[in-house]
Structure formats: C-alpha cells, structure tokens
C-alpha cells in the first residue's frame, strides 16, 4: 500500500529535523511530502520537498476551498489537515492512504501499527482509540475521505477564524465518531 503524509511547514527547521528525517527513512512504506519555504536538506527516497511560500500555500487553500484563509501564523495550517486530501488530490494520485502529522515525533518502526492487516481493515488509522490525533493520522485515499473536512459543522467560519481551533482533532473526530 502507498501512503503519503502531507506536512506544510514554514519558517526555520527545528533543531531536531535531522533526527526526524532519519526516523522517516526508517519507515520506507510511508512518503512524507513537505510544502515549505525552508531550504531543502535534499530529497530522499521517501521524503520530498515542494518549494512554496506561506502566503502562496494559504492563497491556494483559500482559492480551492472558496473561503477567506489568510492566517498570520503557520500554526493555523493545522486546521487545514482534514482538507489535505482535497487540497493535495493531485499530489496524492496513486496513493492508497494520505495523512497528516507533526515533525516533533521520532517514528519508531511503524510497521507494527501501519501494516497490510490494518490498512485492509480500516479506512482511518490514528494513535488514539477514541479520537483522531493531530500528530499522526492516516485516511484511505477515497472520495469520502478526501472530502471529509467539508462534513465538519461550520467549517468555513472555523477556517476563517484567525485562531487555531484544532479542526484536525475534536471537530474531525465528531464527524468520524459522532458523540
């Protein structure tokens, strides 16, 4: 199964970036697709860097989602996570799963958790049993999951709100497992 994790990241790489990239290299079944203005440390077989600015990325999201999305801080991009499948559908062509994650994780051997048995059985994998976790989540690359963000109640106003509202966690969890 082909898996891609989308990570927009702007500013400066954190001091632990080399360690993060090393941990990615130890999980060859997962591709990491960065959208960034940071200097590329160089593509590896499973980590790709797409050069863009924060403003360009926000304008692309605003245009595709038809909302006013012009945050002042990159952390607000976490609220776009439920829409990554839709926003990056071209880059995700050919992948079986897409997902999102944080770069302050050091991945161990994910094959115990992300394996053919789990990928065949589930449409969504996350690190918590009762909710979606923003630090690591995979969704089957199908039309329903590419459009899952549009099912979040009031998604337009949540995206247009300057503050980060955690759309990748509670609001997305409420769509998947209604309370």
Task: Please place each PLM-identified region on the residue numbering.
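Catalytic core and acceptor-binding pocket of nucleotide-sugar-dependent glycosyltransferases
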Residues: 145-179
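A short, conserved acidic/glycine-rich loop-to-beta-strand motif
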Residues: 120-136
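Short glycine- and hydrophobic/aromatic-rich loop-to-beta-strand nucleating segment
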Residues: 135-143
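Short beta-strand/turn micro-motifs composed of small residues
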Residues: 7-9, 34-36, 101
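GT-A fold catalytic core of metal-dependent nucleotide-sugar glycosyltransferases
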Residues: 80-124
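Active-site-proximal specificity loops/subdomain of glycosyltransferases
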Residues: 37-93
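Short, acidic, metal-binding catalytic loop of nucleotide-sugar glycosyltransferases
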Residues: 19-31
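N-proximal low-complexity "stem/linker" segments adjacent to membrane-targeting elements
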Residues: 1-19
């Amino acid at each position: 199964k082909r898996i891609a994790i989308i990570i927009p990241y702007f500013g400066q790489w954190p001091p632990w970036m080399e360690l993060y990239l090393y941990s990615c290299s130890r999980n060859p079944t997962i591709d990491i697709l960065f959208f960034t203005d940071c200097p590329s440390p160089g593509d590896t077989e499973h980590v790709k860097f797409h050069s863009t600015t924060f403003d360009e990325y926000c304008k692309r999201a605003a245009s595709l989602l038809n909302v006013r999305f012009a945050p002042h801080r990159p952390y607000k991009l976490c609220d776009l996570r439920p829409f990554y499948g839709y926003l990056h559908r071209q880059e995700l062509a050919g992948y079986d799963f897409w997902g999102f994650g944080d770069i302050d994780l050091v991945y161990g051997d994910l094959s115990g958790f992300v394996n053919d048995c789990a990928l065949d059985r589930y449409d969504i994998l996350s690190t918590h049993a009762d909710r979606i976790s923003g630090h690591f989540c995979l969704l089957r690359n199908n039309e329903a999951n590419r459009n899952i963000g549009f099912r979040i109640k009031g998604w337009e106003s949540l995206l247009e709100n300057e503050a980060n509202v955690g759309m990748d966690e509670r609001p997305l969890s409420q769509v998947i497992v209604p309370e």
